[in-house]
A protein has these predicted regions:
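General small-molecule cofactor/ligand-binding pocket signal
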Residues: 265-267, 438-441, 473
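C-terminal lid/capping helical subdomain adjacent to the catalytic/cofactor pocket in oxidative enzymes
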Residues: 443, 452-523
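Glycine-rich FAD pyrophosphate-binding loop
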Residues: 26-51
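Conserved Rossmann-like nucleotide-cofactor binding loop
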Residues: 17, 41, 309
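Mid-domain catalytic core of redox enzymes
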Residues: 28, 268-412, 416, 420-430, ...
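Active-site/ligand-binding neighborhood in enzyme catalytic cores
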Residues: 136-138, 142-143, 147-278, 283, ...
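N-terminal Rossmann-like FAD-binding beta1-loop-alpha1 element of flavoenzymes
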Residues: 7-35
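Dinucleotide-binding Rossmann-like beta1-alpha1 core, especially the glycine-rich loop
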Residues: 52-158
Length: 523
């Protein structure tokens, strides 16, 4: 067993940011990480849920980053496959770049797969490319009138730019008014629960980045000319990603085991309820276990990935200004419910050029833009990794994703009633037949998505207040109230460890992660 180190870093949360921080501290410093996880599950929103032999990725996590440090981190812990996975063996596929000498996924579990990325929009009971492409099928599916209106709207948006004071204007500037109203307006309201005119453009700049109809045109020309550049191609247009054999939770569970092997401590069912601060420094935390027992732990640093409103509520022995409390309390979030369905087959079939088993659709996820149903996205777990599915050859394992707010009608609905509604919605839009449903489960995630409205616009005041607490570092999606991808959450942890190593109390490099204009993977 590794020797315990003298100085302690208290880490709130065993998601990607918290676990990355703990791992990096053990590898690069003489500090002892102690991780407190409120639930009994490793991985946060990047967990993998197991149900009757099937595995469900909550929200879908493509492993892709423009940051080489992150890519190398992933593939060092979980090497890239050196032989074909079972689905490629069945189909006789030989089109993937395998890692010579890498593990065989048919024989080994600690392996990361190379996967093709296919995401599409389902609208008007038809499939559209995501992002919207200029293929003939797009215009055929839209019809002549929508095509003319879309072309005119895009032309107007090229010569008349709106002030980007809202997400609505952000989208109109990039796609034109009519395409926005068709493909973005209703879906965005479904996801966030408010109209895009009330959402900040920040979300678009962080999630959509440089994607626009013009970017799609340039990418199409680049492909025609045979030119490919990862650095210059928008990340939403990159066509492959890597993915752990058993989903993201497998990687994070492995990281957790490595942390413990190296002497780090991970305490599960440990809800941090108080953070003691003296002379602008965190001195200790109180956590409550599953039996309700409160325990105090001292530390030299605190890395927090907990929601900002919970962090402010937990601050003790310090006079938190009323305005800071108000801003934190009013920060908006969007919650998330997934229904896992095991079905015999889907009604919709593969009409793409991509070869698939039993002619199944090739998509990893589908954006459901239909306005007569509440479902937001549909995951096809067979296509993420065939090893997520207990009976890959004979069943389809899918995830029906709903965006909601804690306490609203969807959130409060009884589980059986919710599952019935979800099944009925897929039947309604002709994706499944009810009699093909074999099994179902439901998973609910609180505060899955930080939202960009309300007191979010005053968040800088809270950041400034936190930065005055010398040894407090806010990391990850909820820790920074920023809609990060997994790699960004990891980078906040890496930058925090760098700051400690350098003895640098300036936390700007940590807050600055995910502010670059060309960073995101969103397809």
């Amino acid at each position: 067993m590794a020797k315990e180190r003298e100085k302690k870093v208290l880490i709130v949360g065993a998601g990607p940011a918290g676990l990355t921080a703990a791992y990096e501290l053990l590898k690069k410093t003489d500090l002892q990480p102690v991780v407190f996880e409120a639930s009994n599950v490793i991985g946060g929103i990047s967990q993998t849920v197991k149900y009757h032999g099937n595995r469900m990725d909550i929200g879908g996590h493509r492993f892709f980053s423009k940051n080489k440090e992150v890519m190398e981190w992933w593939t060092k812990l979980m090497p890239v496959q050196g032989s074909n996975s079972c689905d490629d063996i069945i189909l006789g596929n030989t089109d993937k770049e395998l890692n010579i000498g890498g593990p065989d996924p048919e024989k080994e579990d600690r392996v990361i797969l190379v996967r093709h990325r296919v995401s599409r929009i389902f609208f008007l009971r038809k499939f559209f490319d995501y992002p919207i492409s200029l293929k003939l099928s797009t215009f055929t599916n839209m019809g002549l009138l929508h095509t003319i209106k879309s072309g005119y709207g895009f032309f107007v948006s090229m010569i008349h730019k709106l002030p980007e004071t809202s997400l609505e204007n952000f989208y109109i500037n990039r796609f034109g008014k009519h395409l926005y109203s068709l493909f973005f307006e209703g879906y965005t309201e479904k996801v966030w629960g408010i109209h895009p005119s009330e959402l900040g453009a920040d979300w678009g700049s962080q999630r959509v980045k440089g994607i626009s109809l013009w970017a799609v045109i340039i990418d199409m020309i680049r492909k025609k000319l045979g030119k490919k550049s990862v650095d210059k191609t928008e990340t939403s247009l990159i066509e492959q990603y890597i993915y752990p054999k058993y989903g993201p939770g497998q990687l994070w569970e492995y990281v957790a085991s490595e942390i413990q092997k190296e002497g780090g401590e991970i305490i599960m069912d440990a809800e941090v309820v108080k953070i003691h601060v003296t002379n602008n420094q965190v001195t200790s935390i109180d956590y409550r276990n599953a039996d309700g027992i409160i325990t105090n732990r001292t530390g030299d640093y605190l890395f927090s990935t907990m929601p900002i409103k919970d962090l402010v509520n937990a601050l003790t022995d310090i006079d938190v200004p009323i305005n800071i409390k108000r801003i934190a309390h009013e920060l908006p979030y969007r919650d998330f419910i997934t229904v896992g369905l095991c079905v015999k087959k889907l009604k919709i079939e593969n009409e793409t050029h991509i070869k698939t088993y039993k002619n199944r659709i090739p998509d990893t996820w589908i954006y459901i833009q239909e306005r007569d149903v509440k479902i937001g996205r549909l995951q096809i777990f067979n296509n993420w990794s065939p090893y997520l599915v207990n009976d890959y050859k004979n069943t389809m394992w899918i995830g029906l994703e709903y965006f909601c707010s804690e306490g609203d009608e969807l959130w409060e609905m009884q589980k059986d009633e919710f599952i019935k509604m979800a099944i009925d919605e897929l039947v309604k839009i002709d994706i499944i037949e009810k009699e093909d449903v074999i099994d179902a489960c439901q998973v609910k995630i609180k505060k899955a998505y930080p939202s960009y409205y309300g007191s979010y616009y005053e968040l800088d005041k809270v950041k400034e207040y936190f930065d005055n607490i010398i040894n407090l570092y806010c990391l990850g999606r909820n820790g920074q109230h920023r809609y990060n991808n997994m790699d960004h959450s990891m980078l906040t942890a890496m930058r925090a460890v760098d700051a400690i190593i350098k003895g640098n109390n300036d936390k700007q490099a940590i807050w600055a992660v995910n502010t670059e204009d060309n960073y995101h993977e969103t397809k």
